[in-house]
């Protein structure tokens, strides 16, 4: 009797469940077998290139031809899964391919973010710098209303009374009420290589000096000659709203510096501050010209 030769399991041909082929070349890209093993890729490099080409096709051709040898019911389910996956990849994969470089990184302009940050930082510095042209025919005095150092407070009062006696219009910037005035004074004194010692007077945008300089110029008559082009005030009076300080409590937070979005029921907005006032909870007075 003839004995039938049995082939080992590894030599038996496996049944192919379905195949995926390229729509351009017709080459088989992937095969899935019925035994549940991982699909074998015939050519991974060619498969990736063909897959990208299929995603970027503008005429809406199908990306793969699915063939099945048996089990028609399972074939229909597999076809639906493959078509759904292909459609989703086509919807989102085209954008990904367009913005990705060969190395897989997102394309962009080199140092674009850092250059933009430097540009905006320089722009804010330029806008914050007081211009001498804007202070033409104007007197600006930097003072303080704090009496911690009595000598400084008395010198500020002396300079203020000197300009009030000349009946000229001047702008007083109290650094105790607004911290931005202090930063502005430091920047302007740094440009003229002078120490910011209160009070400081600027006429026509140029640094004039402190209390001693103003007092000596007033006694010699030089100050009166500089004030000939400055606008005169015939009847000086204090603003009834702010009392001549130029600032009022914030109308939004009433001086508490708390944001309107904060409440007593949650601590999620604890760090929010009012954006309508400064660090002291004050706003510029709108009824006076201080």
Curated annotation (Swiss-Prot):
Tissue expression notes: In the inner ear, expressed predominantly in sensory hair cells and their stereocilia bundles with higher levels in outer hair cells (OHC) at P1 and in inner hair cells (IHC) at P5. At P1, expression is prominent in each row of stereocilia within bundles including immature shorter stereocilia. Expression is also observed in apical microvilli of sensory cells at P1 and in kinocilia at P1 and P5. In the adult, expression is localized throughout the length of the stereocilia of both OHC and IHC (at protein level).
Q: Name one Pfam family in it.
A: Glutaredoxin
Q: Which parts of the sequence belong to the Glutaredoxin domain?
A: 127-234
Give the location in the cell: Cell projection, Stereocilium; Cell projection, Microvillus; Cell projection, Kinocilium
Query: In its keyword annotation, does this UniProt entry include Nucleus?
Result: no
A Gene Ontology term for the protein's cellular component: kinocilium
User: What biological-process terms (Gene Ontology) are attached?
Assistant: auditory receptor cell stereocilium organization; calcium ion transmembrane transport; cell morphogenesis; cochlea development; establishment of localization in cell; exocytosis; inner ear auditory receptor cell differentiation; inner ear development
| Highest taxon, organism lineage | Eukaryota
Entry keyword set: Cell projection, Cilium, Deafness, Hearing
- Disease link: Defects in Grxcr1 are the cause of the pirouette (pi) phenotype which is characterized by vestibular defects and profound deafness with affected mice displaying abnormally thin and slightly shortened sterocilia.
Role of this protein? May play a role in actin filament architecture in developing stereocilia of sensory cells.
Q: Which family does it belong to?
A: Belongs to the GRXCR1 family.
Q: What is this protein called?
A: Glutaredoxin domain-containing cysteine-rich protein 1
Organism from which the protein derives: Mus musculus
């Amino acid at each position: 009797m003839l004995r039938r030769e049995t082939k080992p399991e590894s030599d038996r041909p496996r049944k192919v469940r379905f195949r995926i082929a390229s729509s351009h070349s017709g080459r088989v890209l992937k095969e899935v077998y019925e035994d549940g093993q991982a699909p074998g890729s015939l050519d991974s490099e060619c498969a990736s290139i063909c897959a990208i080409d299929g995603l970027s096709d503008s005429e809406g051709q199908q990306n793969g031809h699915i063939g099945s040898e048996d089990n028609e019911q399972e074939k229909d389910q597999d076809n639906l899964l493959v078509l759904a996956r292909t459609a989703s990849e086509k919807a989102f994969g085209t954008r990904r391919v367009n913005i990705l470089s060969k190395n897989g990184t997102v394309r962009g302009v080199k140092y674009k973010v850092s250059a933009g940050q430097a540009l905006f930082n320089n722009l804010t510095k330029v806008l914050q710098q007081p211009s001498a042209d804007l202070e033409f025919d104007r007197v600006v005095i930097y003072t303080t209303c704090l009496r911690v150092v009595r000598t400084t407070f008395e010198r500020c009062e002396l300079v203020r009374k000197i300009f009030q006696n000349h009946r000229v219009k001047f702008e007083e910037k109290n650094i105790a009420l607004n911290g931005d005035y202090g930063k502005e004074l430091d920047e302007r004194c740094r440009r003229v290589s002078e120490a910011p010692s209160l009070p400081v007077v600027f006429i026509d945008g140029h640094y004039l000096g402190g209390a001693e300089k103003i007092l000596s110029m007033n006694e010699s008559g030089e100050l009166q000659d500089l004030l000939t082009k400055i606008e005169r005030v015939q009847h000086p009076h204090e603003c009834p709203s702010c009392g001549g300080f130029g600032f009022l409590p914030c109308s939004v937070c009433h001086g508490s510096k708390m944001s309107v979005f904060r409440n007593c029921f949650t601590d999620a907005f604890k760090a929010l501050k009012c954006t309508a006032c400064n660090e002291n909870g004050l706003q510029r007075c709108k009824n006076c010209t201080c």
